[in-house]
Amino acid sequence: MKTKFFRVGFVRVSLILVLFFSLVSTIQAGALDTFMGEKGTVKISGGTAHIPVMKEAAKRIMTTNSDIQISIAGGGSGVGIKQVGEGLVDIGNSGRKPTDMEIKKYQLKMFKWAIDGVGVVVNPENKVKALSNAQLIDIFSGKIDNWKDLGGLDKSINVYTRDKASGTRDVFWKKAIDKGEITDKANFVVSNGAMKSAISNDPYGIGYVSVGHIDESVAPVALDGVVPTLENVKQGKYKIARGLYSNTKGEPSGLSKKFIEYLFSPEGQQIAADKGFIPIQ
């Protein structure tokens, strides 16, 4: 009797598992089915915060259909907006909303598919992991230039920043340092990845990255008592936040339209969440 009960139970569990995995496969296939039978290329450039999501989405699409080729480059938000506006790429990513002037000049259509924060980071060996907003402004202006003034070692502070084409810099400049001056002694890096690498290799460095890019190689710095985490951004406690945009020149069509629609699909939004961002749906 026990053997019969075990067999029946096993069959029921097996059937449930089969139905579950079939449902998951159907949902995933449904999002990618739109690319079946398509051919062509999609060129993407711009914001570097977007790249992990872009790469994962592109990989899944190209695995589904090898007749589609998707190229992804960084360069920063300003580059993405300019290149899509000039027809050099199909999709230009930006970590800030394009300005009214850019929208008008390039006839841009904007698609915000996730929310991100910009967090201040230091080397994990640095014991200074909390600052006031006023202290941060003074650090980046060069007014405070030694860690000992903040309770750290008697070592010069090495400031790292991004160039003016960066959407990450734009948000940091506006929301973290109140459009204040950035010292001309600052070291420039070209991407979120390069910023992490620089800070992880400099015990006395300080910079800022997309919250979605923060990992064990750098240490987040609390500002006015609030640590830059995904949850704090989501709850509105951490105010240095921004949208992640994919922009097109005019209404998107063809593969560009399908790629953007994929970003808004349940699967695309899950990719965004998996990469450390807040889905909008």
Could you say what each language-model-derived stretch is?
Residues 1-9:
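N-terminal secretory signal peptides that target proteins for export/translocation
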Residues 11-14, 126-128:
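N-terminal hydrophobic signal/anchor transmembrane helix of membrane proteins
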